[in-house]
């Protein structure tokens, strides 16, 4: 929440920013970073894939947890990176991009971005593992 005081004759009031707004912003920003294949662990991605197919949309907050105060936010990200990237460099770029984007959009100071790299996406693998739609059914 930010306190918007009267300055130069403007109207004062309070602005509150919901956790979901920060989580969505962080999730979308994280997916923009080169080397980040996806967010969330195997279980959350599998559950999310089923939910996304039913709802016909993707959840930008999957793999993102936030704590939002009046002026600050802390962000935790569960990340899947592409095979071959330098994880430390990707994490640094991810941390900076997410913090900068959340601050620019919300005005909140991002005090920390914690990153857990849970998996590596191998070349040729896809989000739909186990869902080989291109292969014919084995049993008819």
Segment roles from a protein language model:
Residues 1-32, 37, 41-42, 50, ...:
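Terminal low-complexity, intrinsically disordered regions
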Residues 2, 37-41, 62, 109-116:
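Short beta-strand elements
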Residues 87-110:
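Short, non-transmembrane amphipathic alpha-helical segments
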């Amino acid at each position: 929440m930010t306190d918007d005081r009267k300055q130069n004759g403007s109207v004062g009031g309070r602005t509150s920013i919901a956790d979901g707004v920060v989580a969505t912003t962080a999730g979308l920003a994280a997916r923009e970073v080169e080397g980040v294949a996806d967010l969330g662990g195997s279980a959350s991605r599998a559950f999310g894939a089923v939910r996304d197919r039913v709802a016909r949309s993707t959840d930008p907050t999957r793999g993102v947890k936030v704590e939002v105060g009046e002026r600050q936010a802390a962000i935790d990200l569960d990340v899947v990176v592409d095979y071959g990237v330098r994880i430390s460099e990707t994490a640094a770029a991810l941390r900076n991009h997410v913090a900068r984007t959340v601050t620019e959009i919300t005005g909140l100071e991002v005090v920390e971005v914690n990153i857990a790299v849970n998996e590596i996406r191998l070349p040729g693998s896809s989000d739909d593992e186990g869902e080989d739609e291109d292969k014919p059914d084995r049993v008819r």
